[in-house]
Amino acid sequence: MPEKGKPMDIHDTNGTLPDRGPTTSAFRGPDRIRRVACLGTGLIGGGFVALFLARGLDVIVWDPAPDAKDRLDQILTTAWTTLERLGARAEDRGTLSWASTAEEAVKTADFVQESAPERLELKRNLYASIELVTPPDVVIATSTSGFSIADLQAGGSQSTRVIVGHPFNPPYLIPLVEVAGAVHTSREALIAAEAFYQSIGKVVIRMDHEIPGFIANHLQAALEREAMHLVAEGHATPQQIDAAVVHGLAPRWSAIGPCMVRHMGSSAGGIGGYFERFNLGSERSLSHHTPPEFTPEFIKAMSEGCRTMEAGRDKATLSAARDRAVIETLLAQRHAGVSRHGV
């Protein structure tokens, strides 16, 4: 087990993470981050709380929802079972405390992870309240998947230390986090955030600029859109689609991504040769750029298919089964030497 506050090596990437240079002293780096403020404790925020605690960091939480504490307890119970299988130990676990206001949570923090509900006005008001009281050398990261930094800061501060730290759900299990900023965002803040996330075992994609949905959600949306069309047009059931992904695409994608799949599958000249011979018409026939109409028949087919796959299991049972399978995949990736970009 790594020393307290250090990453468990389940997400080790065999030394292939890019050298972004030393973390600047303008913002607190991993060696100075012992206390994280988490604003919001939904699935994403609660997942981050679990991850930070497992890495030995102290976490102060703020969430005004009446059921926030009970909800977080449930998330932590589920997450901790998973994290223990990945090597987390109770004696290394950080301490959890609650703040009565967002301002109280951030004023003593070394890093801030905001995961409030995706409501723009709510987030804008939150940033207006915390930016003046957060220590000036502390990075403020948002988990948002739909808003830009410019959206969040419109009409208020143009602080250069607010960045996107967008995870994939659940954050305590899936290694990816996408880091991005606006035009005015400090490069030093991005580097500091990247270094911190790497120090807790994350695989970081630091984007050159923001785009809606970032990278992974764009890819996921394209696949989901095609899946919806296959169901809407009567070509496949939800069960068939999920089977095709779980037993076809997913095992291969756990080792190499779609770009390398195409490169390795091209007979001559790799992916460059493929595009030189590319028949645009045949590819267009496989792709839809917009979702299908959500007719009652479509909704019924999707709902019935997913209920069949649930097989009477509740979400907690399904989540535990998912986590067990993902753990084994991550362990297999490590055993096989899968690095940041694949084999």
Give the role of each language-model region.
Residues 142-209, 213, 217-218:
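Rossmann-fold dinucleotide-binding core
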Residues 2-31, 55, 202, 233, ...:
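NAD(P)-dependent Rossmann-like dehydrogenase/reductase catalytic/cofactor-binding core
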Residues 64-67, 82-139:
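Rossmann-like NAD(P)-binding element
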Residues 72, 76, 130, 152-153:
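Hydrophobic packing residues within well-ordered alpha-helices of enzyme cores
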Residues 59, 112, 140-141, 162:
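Hydrophobic/aromatic residues located in beta-strands of well-ordered beta-sheets
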Residues 4-85:
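NAD(P)+-binding Rossmann beta1-loop-alpha1 motif at the extreme N-terminus of oxidoreductases
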Residues 55-57, 179-210, 221-252:
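Internal alpha-helical scaffold of NAD(P)-dependent oxidoreductase catalytic cores
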